[in-house]
A protein has these predicted regions:
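Conserved alpha-helical substructure of the radical SAM core
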Residues: 65-172
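Accessory C-terminal segments flanking Radical SAM cores
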Residues: 1-77
Length: 172
């Protein structure tokens, strides 16, 4: 069994750490991409998957595939076929850039929406991963897929769009 996200996806977590797939349960955050890529935790997940077994962190994809026959994992295999020809060690960067959002969707919470945070208290969490984004190896980024907050309301998102590395092929 194979999941390209294990080799090619990094996410900006709302606490500022660097993580792997946002669909994982109980995923660990790391200080740097290198620390993540060199971690025993990630090596163990890859080893489990290489044995054609589901890592416990990947239960969401496992259940989705059992019900629907496809998942984030299978969709990432299709995306890998598009991106891999450009660069062997490419990265897709996802996750939370900030939590600037003027909406208060029922399924959201203050960690991803400043609107909800402001309704809950004056001392709500503020997320700002702008600097963290630039710490990711820019030459490896082929796709940017940030969320958390509302990108159209985020000054950070606009600043990143204006300075994307030229190797970036896809922005979602």
């Amino acid at each position: 069994m194979y999941c390209p996200r294990l080799d090619h996806f990094v996410r900006l977590n709302k606490n500022g750490s660097i993580g792997k797939c946002g669909h994982m349960t109980n995923a660990i955050g790391f200080e740097t991409v290198k620390e993540l890529e060199d971690s025993k935790w990630l090596k163990d997940i890859k080893a489990t998957m290489a044995e054609d077994k589901w890592p416990k962190e990947c239960v969401r994809c496992q259940q989705t595939e059992q019900v629907n026959g496809e998942s984030i994992r299978t969709k990432s295999i299709d995306r890998h076929k598009v991106l891999h020809p450009f660069r062997d060690d490419y990265l897709v960067v996802g996750g939370v850039l900030d939590n600037i959002c003027n909406s208060a969707c029922q399924t959201c919470y203050s960690g991803l929406s400043t609107k909800i945070g402001s309704l809950e208290s004056k001392n709500y969490p503020r997320v700002d991963n702008y600097v963290r984004f630039w710490e990711i190896p820019q030459n490896r980024i082929l796709e940017v897929d940030v969320n958390g907050g509302e990108p159209t309301a985020s000054k950070n998102y606009k600043k990143i769009l204006n300075r994307l590395p030229p190797n970036t092929k896809i922005v979602r």
